[in-house]
Amino acid sequence: MLNKPAKPQAAAPATPNASMSMSTDARASMRVTEKAIYKYYNDMGKNKGNCTWGAGILAHKGVCSSEELGRLVNAQSVDIVFGQKVAEAERIVRRSIKVDLNQAQFDALCSLTYNAGPTGASDTFLLINRSDFVGAAANINRMIKVSIVKNGKKTKVVARGLIKRRAEESAPFRAQPVAASALSK
């Protein structure tokens, strides 16, 4: 019985953004937006939103317990986990997006994914993969509401801080490239 050589397996198609990472400027800007708070806190104020710490790092959905609200974190922990979360957002964007992005678009999607998570960003990813950048921009701009529990009922409210952030994240998808033929006129 002869051993047959193994059939070569087709290489997985490379994603068009496989070598991209968040720019230094965008990462620094996001670090300013995600202000470091060196303790656990509720991201929408007293008894509202989700239990969060550091640079907008989700501890868990729902408000912090009184024990958690007393928990302090140090700058090193914030920096380490922020870096891990940014790297995770970059991997998600690289894996999820099948069309070419420019650096500003990649940066914006990393920021969106860091903040909204892969599930929150998934509709935007679908629109971008259909090359519907205008639709993606509109979708990002609508992502300004968060769930809170009020009088025992879950309700959505506008998070004022997200309005500016979503405008910045959607901007690279609103900008339409000028066709080369238009430049030569």
Where are these regions (language model features)?
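Short alpha-helical scaffolding segments that buttress acidic/His motifs in well-ordered protein cores
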Residues: 30, 105-113, 139-140
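Substrate-binding/active-site groove segments that recognize
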Residues: 43-68
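Amphipathic alpha-helical segments that form the core helices of the histone-fold
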Residues: 53-54, 110-114, 126-127
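Short runs of predominantly hydrophobic/aromatic residues within well-ordered alpha helices
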Residues: 47-50, 106, 110, 133
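Long, amphipathic alpha-helical surface segments
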Residues: 1-42, 48, 57, 73-86, ...
